[in-house]
Each structure stands twice: as C-alpha cells, then as structure tokens.
Amino acid sequence: MNLFDVADFYINKIVTSQSKLSVANVNEHQRIKVLLLDKNTTPTISLCATQSELLKHEIYLVERIENEQREVSRHLRCLVYVKPTEETLQHLLRELRNPRYGEYQIFFSNIVSKSQLERLAESDDLEAVTKVEEIFQDFFILNQDLFSFDLQPREFLSNKLVWSEGGLTKCTNSLVSVLLSLKIKPDIRYEGASKICERLAKEVSYEIGKNERTFFDFPVMDSTPVLLILDRNTDPITPLLQPWTYQSMINEYIGIKRNIVDLSKVPRIDKDLEKVTLSSKQDAFFRDTMYLNFGELGDKVKQYVTTYKDKTQTNSQINSIEDIKNFIEKYPEFRKLSGNVAKHMAIVGELDRQLKIKNIWEISEIEQNLSAHDANEEDFSDLIKLLQNEAVDKYYKLKLACIYSLNNQTSSDKIRQLVEILSQQLPPEDVNFFHKFKSLFSRQDKMTQSNHDKDDILTELARRFNSRMNSKSNTAENVYMQHIPEISSLLTDLSKNALFRDRFKEIDTQGHRVIGNQQSKDIPQDVILFVIGGVTYEEARLVHDFNGTMNNRMRVVLGGTSILSTKEYMDSIRSAK
C-alpha cells in the first residue's frame, strides 16, 4: 500500500520497455528514446521521476503530444504515456497517420476501450506501434499514503448535491485506477446521507463488476479491503483551522502545487530559490520533518544547519592531493546538502514571518478553543475582541465567525451579536457568505458523529494515536492542536470493525449489492479513504501516524478530489450553487 512503490513500478515499466525491433536493427541512435506525454501525464511523471532518473534510461527528450511543432526524428524510439481521453486520442491518431518517430510503444494511464484500440489500429497504416499497454496511475501521488485527483468542486459538481456528468466519470475512472494500481477489489462503504457519495460508490461498483474478469480477478485476501467514500462537508471544521505541521503549513501560507513551492513573492529571496521542489520521496530532510509541528521543526532545522556547517568545515581542509580527491568525490553530495539547507531555511523563515504579520498565534488559539468547546463564554468574549481588532485581516474574522457557528448553532442571541459585529467589520458579500455557511451546515445531520459518541472515552489505540493532541495538556503544542479531525475516530472505528452502521452503507462488490446495516465479518487490512470535496495535509498526517501505530496490521491510504488549504475550502463553499 505504498504509493511511491506503485509509481516506481509503473515508471520503471515504461522507461525499461524494450524495442520490438530485432537486435540487429537496433543501432546506437535507436537506444535513445523520446518520452511523449499529454497534459494529464506530464504532472504525473514530474511527481514520480526526476530528469536524472529518465536520463539513466536513455530518455533524452520529453515532449507533449499537444505540441504540433515537434521535429521529425525517425531514428528515435518513442515511449508514449498518455491518458485515454478523447482529446488525447485525437492527437495520437494524427501522430500515427504521420509518424515523427521510428517506433511507438504506447502506455495508457487507465483502462482503454475496445473502440479506442480499434481506432488506433486503423490509423497505424505504417505499423509504427509495437506495443500498447494499460498501466494504472490516473491520479497524483503526493505522499507514500496520500493521493489527489487535483479537481476543484466546480469541475465535478453541478451543485453541492449533484455530480456533473463529466465530473462523475473522471472521479470514477481515477478511483478505479487507484484500486487497480494497488491490486485490490474492495467492499465499498459510503456515507448514506450523502447523495454524491452514494452515486460515486455505485458507479465504482458498476465499473468493478464490468471489468471483473479482465482487471479485478485478484487472489482472495485474508480480509476484504475497504474503500470508504466520505463527504467533506460532514467535517467542515478541519479544513477551516490553521494547520501547525510542516507540510500543511507550507500549503497554507505559501502553497504546494504538485510538489512545487513558489517562493518568488518572499521578500529578498535568492533567485535560485524562487521555485523549489519539495518531495518526501527525494528530500530526506523533508521526509523526516513533514509531519512535525512548528516547534519541533525549529529544532530539526537547527540540527540540519549544524550538520551542514560541520560538513563545510570538514570539506574545507584541503591540504593534499588526497584531500582534493576526497573533496571532488564528495562534492555532489555536499552541493546537494548546501542547496537543501538554503531551501528549508527560506521556507521556515517565510512561515515564521507570516505567522507574525498575520497574528496567527493568537488567531489559531481562539480557533482551537472554539472548535473544542461548546458555548464557552470566555471563548466568545475572546472572539468578539479579535473581531473588533483592526490589526486582524478580514479573512480571518470571517473564518472565526464560521468556526463559532458550527459549534454554537442554538445560541441565537450570540449569533445575532456576531452578525452585528460582522456587518460593521466586513463587506456585505462576506456577511452574506457567513449566512450561507451557517445555513449550509445548520442542516447537517447529527448522525455524522461516529458511534464513539456513545462512549466518550477513546480506546487505548486512539489515546496513543492522539496523545500529542490531548487538550487537557498544558503544553504549547496542544493549545494549537486541540481539534482532532473526524478521520481519527473513523480510523479507530475501522480498526475495531465498529463503523457506525446507521451512517455508512455498504456495497458488497462480490454480489454488487447494497447490504445496508449488516456487520462486516473481518477487520480490513487494507483501507482506502476517499473524500469528495478534498482532504487536508493535517488529515494526511493522522493517516501516516495511524499506519505507524498499526505496524502493518492495518494499512490506510488517503485520497481526495483535491488537497485543501483553508482559503480553498472557503472558496469552494463561496462558489457552490
């Protein structure tokens, strides 16, 4: 269930593909390859493989199939890696009618229909195609246990309750691709109260049934895997709160787009650091720190800089030929370390700057208190003071009011007081947004709470899992991390085979039928959590920690239609019809 292993397997399959021409006909030139991508697979490759890794396999040219100005290079072998969309297929058909390269080996990132294959064959008059193969990576791998489809709600929903036709097809196909890449045929559970979850669950089940003999004929496992489909709006608090761990803070305050961090707007940033790559697969320091809170991160950065200084001093002692030889041997590693130190110093410095200028320390503490406590007078008083503070940005005032409304829907007098202050502090469109937000989530069914509500005391597993976030602790860390995302309780319930049956319906993919409130027989070993409406990096941290706690007894992968920052989540609500 390691997504990086999935990526390596498929990328290796593409780049090591052998020519179908006879060995005698393969000259030096034909060993050199061109990789032809489309707009969908270009980011997939960039997330999973570096340029140097491609060069190792004699791929010296990477091109886009949409580019009609490519030169004719018949001496080159072309590895095509594209998504089987109608748009890409049209480009591919044109390519084969007038081939620019000597040989084509085509890899599709998802299932190809029989009619698509027939159209390809009809266009290949010169028999340039020597291989067509389906591989299954129609999604973006961000962490070893996190994936995204990088789709915004406007791209897949007609309104907040109804799928668009194209959006449903995209999400279904990509989710099927995830299942095939992990080689699992799961039972599907979904939030019964959510129409969009129900529709997606049934579409995925239909696709599994349709392709059962061709693609889903996997060996029977000891316990049936589970695909759990969730609706983002059943836990609106988590994506509203300011995050405090490294990866999630970078996404919140700077932005991470497919592993690229844009630092160009950071004051006095070095030109070489304006755009940097941040990948836990390739950056050991980031892999070690991505889930640390800001306090722990500071200590790690200091250690990292100290290590760099020590290596610098060691390498600077060049008094002999042997020293020069050693320096030259170590220089690539030293240079890489030097660049990495500068990158992380720049990122951490910018995070610290933004925390200060935006008053995040004060805002976040109140956010956490509002999310953790119901109808607390002291919290309300602190909220009013912050709303009336001219130094606090209007965006954070609106967000704080929304957070308060989620836990205090029955406090009508206080809500009225809140609206009065918002009307004085915010523009009319923001006040209207607050009313829209309050209306949207006031109808939220209380059954979204897990069955652990009946027993307030978490299991020992959950207690260990969430020990750092225990709100009774007085440490600074816990003040800013009191809120426990709902995914935590769902994981605990799954690990005990105790999902709330009145909330989650189940489709048995063996019989392709909804089986309602029946108790499943076994605790699943492999679980995919998929959230329609997006997931947060804070939830990704919880899943990662949970996997570590379970030590392979249960393996969880988290995915969503997108990765959310607080602003992106609020924007999605603002634009919802």
UniProtKB/Swiss-Prot annotation:
Gene3D superfamilies: 1.25.40.60, 3.40.50.1910, 3.40.50.2060, Syntaxin Binding Protein 1, Chain A, domain 2. Interacts with PEP7 and TLG2. Belongs to the STXBP/unc-18/SEC1 family. Transmembrane segments: none annotated. Keywords: Cytoplasm, Membrane, Protein transport, Transport, Vacuole. It is found in: Cytoplasm; Vacuole membrane. GO terms for biological process: cytoplasm to vacuole targeting by the Cvt pathway; Golgi to endosome transport; Golgi to vacuole transport; Golgi vesicle fusion to target membrane; intracellular protein transport; positive regulation of SNARE complex assembly; protein targeting to vacuole; vacuolar acidification. One of its GO terms (cellular component) is cytosol. This is Vacuolar protein sorting-associated protein 45. Present with 5660 molecules/cell in log phase SD medium. The lineage of its organism: Eukaryota, Fungi, Dikarya, Ascomycota, Saccharomycotina. It comes from the Eukaryota. One of its GO terms (molecular function) is unfolded protein binding. It holds the Pfam family Sec1. It is a peripheral membrane protein. Essential for vacuolar protein sorting. Function in membrane traffic between the Golgi and the vacuole.
